[in-house]
Amino acid sequence: MQEAGIDEFAAGGGHVEPAAEVDPAAALKAELRSKPGDWYVIHSYAGYENKVKANLETRVQNLDVGDCIFQVEVPTEEVTEIKNGQRRLVNRKVLPGYILVRMDLTDDSWAAVRNTPGVTGFVGATSRPSALALDDVVKFLLPSGSAKKDAKGAVSTAAAAEAGGLERSIIEVDYEVGESVTVMDGPFATLPATISEVNAEQQKLKVLVSIFGRETPVELTFSQVSKI
């Protein structure tokens, strides 16, 4: 009977149904839910996020609090940047000035984080910080994976255009410094923002978005915002 089953499978061309596509956000959320601890946001100085991450990871080892501080992340996304006419892929921080920490909140873990050089405090109540919702954690951590595909596509399109295979489109700059816009894409979608800088060559804007009650500069493309 087993041989007959194999013959029938071969006769049918050995067709196997393709696996269903997995939603990256749902998969990441399930993975995060299975891990211990809650996610908290700590504030630092913009530009020092990676240094603070390294400082905290060193303190976790030195203070032997690895049983309550499990993971430290500086969320990044891969984007295409145009500089001097050349396109290149760069890692950009999703939350400038902020670091995510997965931990069990205890007196020891709180003190280890709060007294780390470069940390200016937890986001939330001073005595008892609030954990970040899992959906928000997914929103901040997921762009690093999804942005890579977009960035690669942008590079391919640029190469094709330079080879004459595509006609470069001209995008009219219709944004001004001080103008209010709505973020349409990415982790800050639906939030209002104020334009602080316009880069016509790279087709990007620097906007101020209120993140955790504080105005934070975020870099976005023209297509990621909409006029109010």
Curated annotation (Swiss-Prot):
Gene Ontology biological process terms, A to Z: DNA-templated transcription termination; regulation of DNA-templated transcription elongation; transcription antitermination; transcription elongation-coupled chromatin remodeling
Q: Which UniProt keywords apply?
A: Transcription, Transcription antitermination, Transcription regulation, Transcription termination
**SMART domains tied to this protein:** NGN
Alphabetical list of SUPFAM superfamilies matching this protein: N-utilization substance G protein NusG, N-terminal domain, Translation proteins SH3-like domain
Q: Which GO terms describe its cellular component?
A: cytosol
Q: Is Transcription regulation there in the keyword field?
A: yes
Q: Which Pfam families match?
A: NusG (PF02357)
Task: Please give the HAMAP family that the UniProt record associates with this protein.
Answer: NusG
Q: Which PANTHER family match?
A: RHO-INTERACTING TRANSCRIPTION TERMINATION FACTOR NUSG, TRANSCRIPTION TERMINATION_ANTITERMINATION PROTEIN NUSG
Protein family according to the UniProt entry: Belongs to the NusG family.
Task of the protein: Participates in transcription elongation, termination and antitermination.
- Name this protein carries in UniProt: Transcription termination/antitermination protein NusG
